[in-house]
């Protein structure tokens, strides 16, 4: 009898282990060990101040949701509210930068906002509310999205509603500065369900992406002037690099059913062509001339996985990621890998409406 009981226990343990294994996302588990404190702070160790950004917190929340890791999601959310939003994301946008000051105090280093982190945070909260059936997340996400619309969206003559990179420092009387990587088209589509200004922003965001890449390479930053339009031949060379790499990744993650995806892929085809020809994405490209220099780091290769349509070219970048997987001191490369490789491994997809389609599996639906 004891032998039978022992055998049954062993079988149950093996079954439980197999379910856990099916639910585990190894890259996410390693990211938590290397980059997230027990309290829920996503740390960038490459900076001497051991900084945390609202971007990092938002990417952590997205990854936790995609991994069905509710405990991590709650920790990251709680730390963000308590340390970046003075206790409530309903009442204020999160400060974008937190870390160690010269006097050794740990606190907010820059209270300005960063809309790339803000929109991912709002979207992750809204989707967490839907998928985990938790009204609290929905309420916080809705309030945050309304605050983004009030504090970070402006009306630009000749364009319409546009998302500023932050609430302070990007708008002058007749000039506005934008970052094309800050609002992924999939999120822009998702937010249209909330009405103005998001219905307009989806269209103007498409213009930002399509009209600022004359040679097929998106700029990290670009300026728009009243009556003059996009300033693509600025005094200072416009570069496509560490910010813009996300543009190609976001475009690649658009569902094939989105009628704008083919147009976007075609606009940025030179980036795909360069990567296919050379075996790696460029680190920097002159937006005006299309001249590339340097070899992009491993995170760039991960970001290209959703974007590349050629399977052989995908395989080359997939192998480059596997051979050079980010370590414990490469925050940005790692988050790009969570997105790009995670998508490539079918750990998540996005619907035509911009909703998350996680690959939790039926047996994983309640695992946190």
Swiss-Prot record:
<dbReference type="InterPro" id="IPR019834">
    <property type="entry name" value="Glyco_hydro_8_CS"/>
</dbReference>
<dbReference type="GO" id="GO:0030245">
    <property type="term" value="P:cellulose catabolic process"/>
</dbReference>
<comment type="function">
    <text>Hydrolyzes carboxymethylcellulose.</text>
</comment>
<keyword id="KW-0964">Secreted</keyword>
<protein>
    <recommendedName>
        <fullName>Endoglucanase</fullName>
        <ecNumber>3.2.1.4</ecNumber>
    </recommendedName>
</protein>
<comment type="pathway">
    <text>Glycan metabolism; bacterial cellulose biosynthesis.</text>
</comment>
<keyword id="KW-0732">Signal</keyword>
<dbReference type="InterPro" id="IPR012341">
    <property type="entry name" value="6hp_glycosidase-like_sf"/>
</dbReference>
<keyword id="KW-0136">Cellulose degradation</keyword>
<keyword id="KW-0378">Hydrolase</keyword>
<dbReference type="GO" id="GO:0005576">
    <property type="term" value="C:extracellular region"/>
</dbReference>
<dbReference type="InterPro" id="IPR008928">
    <property type="entry name" value="6-hairpin_glycosidase_sf"/>
</dbReference>
<feature type="signal peptide">
    <location>
        <begin position="1"/>
        <end position="21"/>
    </location>
</feature>
<keyword id="KW-0119">Carbohydrate metabolism</keyword>
<feature type="active site" description="Nucleophile">
    <location>
        <position position="116"/>
    </location>
</feature>
<dbReference type="GO" id="GO:0008810">
    <property type="term" value="F:cellulase activity"/>
</dbReference>
<keyword id="KW-0624">Polysaccharide degradation</keyword>
<feature type="active site" description="Proton donor">
    <location>
        <position position="55"/>
    </location>
</feature>
<dbReference type="Pfam" id="PF01270">
    <property type="entry name" value="Glyco_hydro_8"/>
</dbReference>
<comment type="similarity">
    <text>Belongs to the glycosyl hydrolase 8 (cellulase D) family.</text>
</comment>
<dbReference type="InterPro" id="IPR002037">
    <property type="entry name" value="Glyco_hydro_8"/>
</dbReference>
<keyword id="KW-0326">Glycosidase</keyword>
